[in-house]
Amino acid sequence: MPGSRRVRPRLRALLLLPPLLLLRGGHASDLTVAVVLPLTNTSYPWSWARVGPAVELALARVKARPDLLPGWTVRMVLGSSENAAGVCSDTAAPLAAVDLKWEHSPAVFLGPGCVYSAAPVGRFTAHWRVPLLTAGAPALGIGVKDEYALTTRTGPSHVKLGDFVTALHRRLGWEHQALVLYADRLGDDRPCFFIVEGLYMRVRERLNITVNHQEFVEGDPDHYPKLLRAVRRKGRVIYICSSPDAFRNLMLLALNAGLTGEDYVFFHLDVFGQSLKSAQGLVPQKPWERGDGQDRSARQAFQAAKIITYKEPDNPEYLEFLKQLKLLADKKFNFTVEDGLKNIIPASFHDGLLLYVQAVTETLAQGGTVTDGENITQRMWNRSFQGVTGYLKIDRNGDRDTDFSLWDMDPETGAFRVVLNYNGTSQELMAVSEHKLYWPLGYPPPDVPKCGFDNEDPACNQDHFSTLEVLALVGSLSLISFLIVSFFIYRKMQLEKELVSELWRVRWEDLQPSSLERHLRSAGSRLTLSGRGSNYGSLLTTEGQFQVFAKTAYYKGNLVAVKRVNRKRIELTRKVLFELKHMRDVQNEHLTRFVGACTDPPNICILTEYCPRGSLQDILENESITLDWMFRYSLTNDIVKGMLFLHNGAICSHGNLKSSNCVVDGRFVLKITDYGLESFRDPEPEQGHTLFAKKLWTAPELLRMASPPARGSQAGDVYSFGIILQEIALRSGVFYVEGLDLSPKEIIERVTRGEQPPFRPSMDLQSHLEELGQLMQRCWAEDPQERPPFQQIRLALRKFNKENSSNILDNLLSRMEQYANNLEELVEERTQAYLEEKRKAEALLYQILPHSVAEQLKRGETVQAEAFDSVTIYFSDIVGFTALSAESTPMQVVTLLNDLYTCFDAVIDNFDVYKVETIGDAYMVVSGLPVRNGQLHAREVARMALALLDAVRSFRIRHRPQEQLRLRIGIHTGPVCAGVVGLKMPRYCLFGDTVNTASRMESNGEALKIHLSSETKAVLEEFDGFELELRGDVEMKGKGKVRTYWLLGERGCSTRG
C-alpha cells in the first residue's frame, strides 16, 4: 500500500545470538509457554487481564484430558510487551522475548498482539525455531512467511477482511472503483492503517479494480473538506476506518454536502463494533444517536451507512466460555469482562493453545520432541479444529479463516441490525432471513457514476448527431414551442375575457340592509352546541360575543360583511382589475372569501364573507371568554396558515395585519380579512389618537417611511404577527408594556426612534412557553432580515403544540371524542365492578338461604311455607362447653367455635344436607329439604354425623391442645314445615315436633356418640349398611319413654362410635 512503512525490529543484533546458548532452564517433563502481552494496560483486546483467564481455562482442559500431553506439565512464564508509558512497544516486546528465551527456554510463545510488538518477536522465534501463537497481530505483513515462518494466527486477520469485501463487491456488482479513508495516529499501534492495508491490498489483487485511499487526522477539521472532495472525485463506495464519533461527523458533513444514500454508500470498518456496543453487548443499536440536537440529521445521514464487524460466535460452547471467563477474570485477575466483540480475542487464544497442545501431542506420539517447532507448526496449519469459538480453520499460510457481519439500519426504527454474515471458510455471504439490505432507491448505487466521475463518458457528451436525430429534435422542439405559445395565447385570451366580464361587480341595489340583532337571533337558534356547563361557553353563546361594529347586508340571500371605502370614485384601471381578479382567485380556509365590490359612487364598498363570532381583538378583550392554550394555539395556527397562503400567492403581503382584521366564523375558524385591493385603501387616514392606535401593529421600518407601500411588506407582516402573538399570550391589550401607561402616539414615537434595545411589548414568561416568547422576539426584531418567514413560524409552532395542530372546533370535537372514549371505559369498569359485587352478594345470599329459596327471592317471588313429609334433622353440642367457656377468654371461645365450625362446614359440603343454624355450641343440620331426596336424607345425615365425629376426634383446641373436644349428636326423622321468616336478616326456619324430638335426642345423648330415634333407625335399615346398637328406652321430657339406638358406623368404613 502506498505510504505504508514496513515493520522492522530495532534489535536485529539479537538475531545473531546462537540458539544453543538460549536453551537453558526447565525440566524434561515441563512444557513452558512464554507469554508476551500487555500486563497492565487493559484497553488492548489481547491484554493479559483478558487473555490470562482464557489461557488458564485452556490449561485446565488440557489437564482434564489424559490423552493430551500425557506425563507432561505445562507451565507459563510472563513477559510484558509494554514500555514505561503502558503502550505496546517494538523495543520492550523483543527484549522480554529474549529474556524469556534465555532464562526459561520456552517451547512456544503466546503473543504479542500488537503489530509493532509482534513483528520483531515473530522474526526472533523464526530464527530460534520456536512456534509463535497469537490471536492478535492482524496486519498483512505478519502473513509473509519468509520472515514469520513459525507464526500462527488463531484470531482475525485483516487480509481476511479483504476477502470479505471482495465477496461483497462481487455480490453487489461493484467491479470498477472504491475509496478507502482512514484515520491515522502516529505513536500508537495504528489499527486503522493496518485494517485498511489488508483490505486495500487484497481487493486490488482479487478484483483488479481501482482502490483510492486518503489519510486524515480525526482532530483536525481542515481535513474533512478534503475528504468530501475526494469522495466526490473518486468514490461512490467508500470504506472508512475511524472512531464512531469521527464517522458520525463525516456522515453529517456528507449529508450537508448532498452525498446521500441514493448515490453513495459508506462502510464503517468498526471490526470490534465499538459504535454498536452497549451494556448488553452487541444488540440493535443507534450509532447515530448522541442527544446533541443533531440526531435527526444524523439518522438521515446514516441511511447511506453500513457497518462491518467481526461475527460474534453464538454457539453454546462460546456462551459457556464467556461465563467462565467473566468469573475467573473477576476472581483471579480483579478485572471485569464486559460483553462485546473484544472477547473473540481471548477465546481465540484459548482455542489456539488447545490446537498447539494437540499438535505437540501428535508430534510426541510420532517420536518427535517439543522443540521440533517446524513440525509442530506444520501440524497446526491447513487444519480444522472445533473450539469454543466454533469451527476453527487454519489455512495453508497459518492464518485463521475469519467470519464477518454486515450491519444496516432499519429505516423504520433507526436501529442497526445484522443483514449479512460472511463465512470465512466457504467465502460465502449468507443473508439474515428476517432482515434485508436497505437502499433508498431499492438497489445499490453504482460504484462509478453513469457518466464517470469527471463526466468523461463519450455517451454523455455527444457533439455530433445524425440527420435523422437532428430532424427529430427540431421537430420535437417546434411542436413543444407551438404548444407553449398556443397555451400562453389561450391563457391571455381567457384572462382578458375574465377582466372584461367584471364577475366581481355588485350593484348597490342588489344589497338588502340587514338587522344585526335579527341575524344574531337566527344564528343563535341554529347553534348545535350549548355553552351551558362548558368551559367554552363564552365562545359558544350568541350574547355579546360578536363584532357589533361590522356592517352587514344580504346579497343574493347570503349575509355578507360590507366595508365602505372612503373614496369619491374608483378608476377601473388595468391595475385595479387585476387586483379584483386576484381577490376572486383567493380560495383558502383561513382568508375571508371575497364576494365582490360595488364601484357605484357614492356607495363604493367591498363585500366579503361575514364571520359572526367577531374579531380576534373582540374575543381577547372580552374577559368573560375563557381561552386555554389549546384555543390560543388554534387561533395562532390559523393566522399562520392564512398568512403563509397569502405570502405565497399573487397578493404577496397583507400590509395591515392586526387583531381586529382577524375574524372568527361560526365554526371557530380564524380568518384574515382586509387583505389585497390596495387601490381601495383610504387615501386620507384618520388623524390623532385613532391614527396612532391603528399603527401599533406596524413595523418600525414602515413607520419611518414618508409614503409606505399600501401592501406593506412580508417582513412587516411578520412584525405585525409578533404583536398579535403577544396579545394572544397575555390578553392585556395591544402593545402592553408592564409598568408604563403610554399613549399610542408615545409608543409609535419610541418604536420609530429605534432605541437600543428596541422598544417592544412586555413578555410575561409565566403565562406562556419560553419558546413562544423567543418566537415573539424574533418576529419583532429590529432588522427585517432577522425575522423568520411564516414557513419557519409554522414549524416552530408545531414543536410547541404537537397535540393540537388543527382549528378550535376540530380540537373541541377531538376532546369530546376523548371524553366519550373515557366514559365508555368508565362504564365498562363500573359494570364489571357491579357484576363482581352482584356475584359476592349472591354468594352471601346462598350462604344465608338455600339455593332454591334464594333463586325465588332473586326472581321477586314470594317464598311460601312448605310442609315436608319426611326429613332427617341433626343436632349436636359440646359437652362441658359452659365450663370450658368459663375457663377461657371471650376471644379464645370465639376462636374455638370459629375453628370448629369451619371444620364442620368443610365436612358437610360433601353431603346432601343444609346447615340451618348455629347457636353457641349447638349445630343444626337437615337433609330432605328444601329439595326432596326421597329416603336418602337419613343416610346422608348418618354419614355426615360419622364424618363429623371422626373430624372432632382429631380436632385440637388452640389454647388447650391436650384436651379432647367431646361432641354429642342426636338425630331424628319425621315431618316438618319450613319457610323464610323476617325481612331484615331473613332466616330459613323449621317448625314441628320433629325439631323438638331431634333436640331431645341430642340432649339425652352421650359424648362422642351418635344418638338415633327409632324413626331414623327404621329408614336406615332400608340401606342395609349401617351398624346400629340398641340403647334401650330413654325417658324424655314431653315424650315419656322412647326407644333409641346408637349409630356405630357404616360397614366398609373405619369410623366407630
From Swiss-Prot:
Residues 491-1057 are cytoplasmic. One of its GO terms (molecular function) is ATP binding. Its main location: membrane. Disulfide bonds join 88-114, 192-241, 451-460. The keyword Protein biosynthesis does not apply. Residues 872-1002 form the Guanylate cyclase domain. The keyword Phosphoprotein applies. It comes from the Eukaryota. Residues 29-469 are extracellular. PROSITE patterns: ANF_RECEPTORS, GUANYLATE_CYCLASE_1, GUANYLATE_CYCLASE_2, PROTEIN_KINASE_DOM. Belongs to the adenylyl cyclase class-4/guanylyl cyclase family. Receptor for the atrial natriuretic peptide NPPA/ANP and the brain natriuretic peptide NPPB/BNP which are potent vasoactive hormones playing a key role in cardiovascular homeostasis. Plays an essential role in the regulation of endothelial cell senescence and vascular aging. Upon activation by ANP or BNP, stimulates the production of cyclic guanosine monophosphate (cGMP) that promotes vascular tone and volume homeostasis by activation of protein kinase cGMP-dependent 1/PRKG1 and subsequently PRKAA1, thereby controlling blood pressure and maintaining cardiovascular homeostasis. This is Atrial natriuretic peptide receptor 1. The gene is Npr1.
